[in-house]
């Protein structure tokens, strides 16, 4: 019986994995660690696979929306304003908005 418990414990311990969690540096936000997760959580339900105007699936699409488009302005609007994003969703928190602004100010790099 002790062997069975030992072997079971050994199997459990060796099957555990560790996934490194990406940390978002708010002074130097990166696309992969900071920007992409914000967009995935708040925008992709509508802005993917042709479900709404202005897809945001790729780096290029998102960069255009932030650098050349008006995405920053639209996420800063009041929730009742026409054009507010995310449409019928909760406003992004100030930290998320500042990360997107800082990413744009830093050149909107694909990193």
For every predicted segment, state its role:
Residues 16-111:
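Aromatic- and Gly/Pro-enriched helix-to-coil junctions and flexible linker segments
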């Amino acid at each position: 019986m002790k062997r069975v418990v030992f072997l079971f414990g050994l199997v459990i311990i060796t099957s555990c994995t560790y996934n490194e969690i990406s940390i978002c540096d708010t002074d130097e936000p990166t696309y992969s660690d900071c920007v992409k997760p914000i967009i995935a959580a708040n925008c992709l339900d509508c802005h993917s696979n042709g479900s709404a105007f202005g897809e945001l699936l790729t780096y290029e699409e998102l960069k255009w929306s932030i650098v050349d488009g008006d995405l920053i302005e639209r996420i800063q609007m009041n929730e009742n304003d026409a054009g507010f994003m995310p449409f019928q969703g909760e406003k992004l928190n100030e930290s998320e908005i500042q990360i997107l602004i800082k990413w744009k100010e830093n050149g909107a790099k694909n990193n």
